[in-house]
């Protein structure tokens, strides 16, 4: 009657494996263990809306007809997570990266500029959110999907961000929930 680890993953409020440092530690070692898939959607959001659940480490692109595409994502680590509503104000393929001043203060070893490419932390695509420094972007660290490790951006595998990028238009509503 032993309860195996696999049975502990249910979405219950008191389960330490659902979120937090333990979940981050366990999820960081999985290689794309969060496959993109079409799932049932019961929310009231209109088709074309992006909904991010930081607690689930998932991004949903609402298709309509009671369906959404679900992606695994990396989210802001403790002290860097946020919630609210933004819209996609710009899209870029293989974006250049300029770390913000706050990040450079924490990490003076970072380059001041990095051209777009496979080594760039923004990955293959970026969708800029409002006038903030936040983005939904690809990543050259796919092993971080499912973890809270970023400085507030929503990161995706490059394969998934290309798929989402092709679906999204400038002006798309983005809702981020905890």
Task: Give the residues covered by each predicted segment.
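Sec/Tat signal peptide C-region and signal peptidase I cleavage site
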Residues: 1-13
């Amino acid at each position: 009657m032993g309860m195996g680890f696999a049975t502990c993953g249910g979405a219950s409020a008191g389960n330490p494996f659902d979120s937090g440092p333990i979940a981050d530690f366990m999820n960081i070692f999985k290689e794309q263990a969060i496959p993109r898939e079409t799932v049932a959607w019961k929310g009231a959001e209109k088709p074309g809306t992006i909904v991010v659940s930081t607690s689930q480490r998932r991004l949903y692109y609402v298709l309509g007809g009671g369906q959404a595409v679900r992606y695994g994502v990396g989210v802001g680590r403790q002290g860097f997570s946020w919630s609210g509503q933004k819209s996609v104000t710009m899209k870029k393929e293989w974006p250049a990266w300029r770390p913000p001043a706050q990040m450079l203060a924490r990490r003076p070893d970072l380059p001041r500029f990095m051209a777009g490419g496979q080594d760039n932390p923004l990955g293959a695509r970026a969708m800029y959110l409002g006038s903030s420094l936040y983005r939904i972007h690809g990543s050259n660290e796919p092993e971080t999907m499912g973890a809270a490790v970023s400085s507030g951006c929503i990161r995706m595998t490059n394969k998934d961000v290309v798929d989402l990028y092709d679906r999204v238009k400038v002006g798309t509503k983005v809702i981020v929930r905890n």
